[in-house]
Amino acid sequence: MVVFDCRIMAFTATRRPKPPETRNMLNPLPAALVAASVALGGPESAEAPAPSAYVLNHTMKNIDGIDTDLAQFKGKVVLMVNVASECGYTQQYKGLQKLFAEKKDQGFVVLGFPANEFGGQEPGSNADIKAFCTGTFEVTFPMFSKISVKGANQHPLYKQIAAQPAPIGGDPKWNFTKFLIDKSGNVVNRYEPSTAPDDAKLRARIEELLAAK
């Protein structure tokens, strides 16, 4: 006759394997998957900050080589133009000077930045450029030393403007590209070289910015 030991059976019953713990079934995503989610723009990703539209935070050398802090023009409406002496648009100097003379007492200023990136049409020295624009067009608005407005040596001022969102951003396409800056020092409009200084829409926009508080 076989005799069962109830104590052994009871002990065996208590050693049944436990089910897997809940926490093991709910493991978090592997770090690699989280990183991929962030890289693809997941909720933990952070967008790069937009470049500042304030562009008067630069010190430039004027046409005579003297350091000029652009912050001095804050409070004015500014038209920035990359100029050249041997360009088909060079005659715009005349219109720019007329516009400046007409509105300077209202708080408007033109800033000229000579550049030689387009067709090598500004080959002269700063002294040559000054003699040309003052002698030929009687320019009295502020002129600055020659800089690079595009390419590997692009000046930080134009690099900052190029980084702006469309339709303002991007390198100048040619000489006499124009950027309009409001009284707060923010670049607000872009005009291509074909836009003449007496263009009705350009003038209306300048008037609008001059009237703003």
Language-model regions, residue ranges each:
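Bacterial N-terminal signal peptides that target proteins for export
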Residues: 22-30
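Amphipathic alpha-helical repeat scaffolds
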Residues: 62, 82-86
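Structural microenvironment flanking redox-active thiols in thiol-disulfide oxidoreductases
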Residues: 89-155
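N-terminal "domain-start" segment that seeds a small globular fold
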Residues: 46-71, 156
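Bacterial N-terminal signal peptides
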Residues: 30-39
